[in-house]
């Protein structure tokens, strides 16, 4: 068993994120890895649990990845976006607050923005991470 308090995990600021071969700005976002376990055969974790903090107005732009993820909103309010995988057009926009769980399947383009006046937080559980470059 591995036990750790989230404040004891190193907080890393995220500035850029790749999508379709281009780097996109990530605004006001930091991440703490709470756990990383397993090996997908390429030296990367198969499972991870992360803690995100996004400042007011901060956002994670459109992106996708091989792994599945489930986010659980702890505080603040987010506008969550789903995009068409072929055209990148916005197909769904949902406001999510504390207690909301959001599942993103593998390779589904998505993003989010903190629309509250306070730092917003969520946990993000990921499975089957295949490419370190694609993990936020």
Which sequence ranges carry the predicted segments?
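Short, conserved beta-strand element in jelly-roll/cupin
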Residues: 51-55, 65-80, 84, 125-127
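Conserved hydrophobic/aromatic beta-strand scaffold that supports enzyme active sites
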Residues: 31-33, 49-53, 70, 93, ...
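Double-stranded beta-helix
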Residues: 2-10, 85-88, 109-136
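Short beta-strand His + acidic residue motifs that chelate non-heme Fe in jelly-roll/DSBH
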Residues: 60-63, 80-82, 104, 110-116
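Short glycine/proline-enriched turns and hinge-like loops at secondary-structure junctions
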Residues: 45-46, 64-65, 90, 115-117
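A short, N-terminal "cap"/entry segment at the start of jelly-roll beta-barrel domains
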Residues: 1-46, 94
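Conserved short histidine dyad/triad with adjacent acidic residue
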Residues: 33-37, 48-65, 106
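Short acidic-glycine-tyrosine-enriched beta hairpin
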Residues: 85-106
